[in-house]
Each structure stands twice: as C-alpha cells, then as structure tokens.
Amino acid sequence: MKLAAIDVGLKRIGTAICLDGRIVMPQNAILRKNRNQAAHDVVSFLEEWEIEKLVVGLPKGGSSSEEMERRIQHFVSLLELDIPVVYQDEQGSSFEAKEMTQGQFRHKKDGKIDSIAAKIILERHLSL
C-alpha cells in the first residue's frame, strides 16, 4: 500500500511517502499561501504518487494543541479524499527533525524540516 504523511503548519505542509511499506522518503514541502491552494496542492501530490492512505500529524497535549487539532482536521476536510485518512500523534516530530539535521544544512524556511517531520510521523505510524 502506498502511504503519504503530511505535517500541516500555518506556512508550510511537510510531505513524506512510503511506496513499499518499508522506506519512508521526505518530499518537497508545500508552501501554504491559502487554504484552498494548499488543499489543491496536497490533493495533486497524493494523486501524483497514487497514494492509497494518508497519515496526518496531529498534536497531542500542549497549550495550543486543541486549536491546531481543529485547524488540521478542518484542512483535511477540505481535501475531500476518497482514501483512508488516519491521524498520528506528531508531538516532538519537528523538534526531532531539527535535532536530526543539525549542522547538515541551514535551517532555512524551505520546508525541509517540515518534510522530515512528516517522515517521522509516517515512520511512527508504520511502527504501530
């Protein structure tokens, strides 16, 4: 089964795929100009890779997690997908991504960290 994960942020959406059930690869992040454009770009990404299941990072715990959870679920509803969508705890994934890449490249706002966070989210889902 071909899987994808997204790490939904306010400015960028990190993406990762797993096509063989074993190897998870981060992909280019999607720049979020507005909700509709971002939703369209996510759907195009899923169609391009013929994804059969989407894993979405969802924050659990923390002071602002309820608001972000609501925003993420609303964003996912805009996708109008015909494939299964599951939510995976994303707590600490962005911090872990920054730790993993420390010194490898400058932490520019190009979405690399977001997509590595999506990779971590998908790896967590696969290890369940």
UniProtKB/Swiss-Prot annotation:
CDD domains referenced in this protein's UniProt entry, alphabetically: YqgF
Pfam families listed in its UniProt record: RuvX
Superkingdom of the organism of origin: Bacteria
GO cellular component annotations of the record: cytosol
InterPro entries, per database record: RNaseH-like_sf, YqgF, YqgF/RNaseH-like_dom, YqgF/RNaseH-like_dom_sf
Family: Belongs to the YqgF nuclease family.
Gene3D superfamilies: YqgF/RNase H-like domain
GO molecular function list: nuclease activity
UniProt enzyme class: hydrolase
Entry function: Could be a nuclease involved in processing of the 5'-end of pre-16S rRNA.
Matches recorded under SUPFAM superfamilies: Ribonuclease H-like
Keyword Hydrolase attached: yes
Protein name per its UniProtKB record: Putative pre-16S rRNA nuclease
